[in-house]
Amino acid sequence: FKFLKKEMAKNNKKFKFSNQVYDNIFWSVFSGVTIWTFYEAIYWYGIANGIVKTSSFQSSPVQFFLWIICLPLIRGTHFYFIHRLLHVPFLYKHVHVTHHRNVNTGPWSGISMHPVENIIYQSSPLIHIFIPSDPMIFTLHLILVTLNPAFTHSGFEQIKNKKTKLLDSADFHHQLHHRYFDCNYGNMDVPLDVWFGTHHDGSEEATKAMRLRMKGAATK
């Protein structure tokens, strides 16, 4: 159930240390975890100093559950539009290319990004600085943004125990983005790719439609 049969790259100079896994670990820790820690520190510093207002579950249980419902919508919408931004040629060439070298993805590929991309990508939880929520919601939001990509980039469609499927694994929708680049900018929590005509379902027809769309964009 692996999307691509080949293993992660070794002896390939386009990756740091000529090793894709080591490269991904480096960028995930040096860039991803650093930005993650920075945003978390800002949030908790704001609370400790009375700058950031919160709304606890005890005081607003309805609001708490509304946040739970809205998190995938907020994250999905934010991801689609910042991802389109990162495919602007200048940002792609100097920033997003660090992540896109991973055509064959693995768990460490998820937040293996240039620091500028991690600053942009991980910024959706900052909404909680401006709109009060329970700190647990902020923590959950940040976990979704930082740890979920390890799962969706795993490269395996399913996790199985012998013949029994335990759960679905990597996101085929996003796997196609790493293969074709100019499609599937978001996720299916919010079907913006469908609405904006950038959806690819893996079929030959979708590939032809994508190429026609890109050809048309290039001639404008």
Predicted feature residues:
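Function-critical hydrophobic alpha-helical transmembrane segments in multi-pass membrane proteins
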Residues: 60-93, 97-100, 109-113
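Hydrophobic alpha-helical membrane-embedded segments
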Residues: 1, 35-39, 71-82, 142, ...
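Early transmembrane hairpin module of multi-pass membrane proteins
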Residues: 1-41
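Juxtamembrane helix-loop-helix connectors linking adjacent transmembrane helices
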Residues: 38-74
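Membrane-water interface at transmembrane helix exits
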Residues: 39-43, 47, 79-87, 129, ...
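Residue-level signature of transmembrane alpha-helical entry/exit and packing/kink sites
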Residues: 24, 60-68, 118, 137-138
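Cytosolic/stromal cytosol-facing helical appendages immediately following the last transmembrane segment
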Residues: 1-18, 89-220
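Hydrophobic alpha-helical transmembrane segments of multi-pass integral membrane proteins
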Residues: 29-44, 70, 121-127
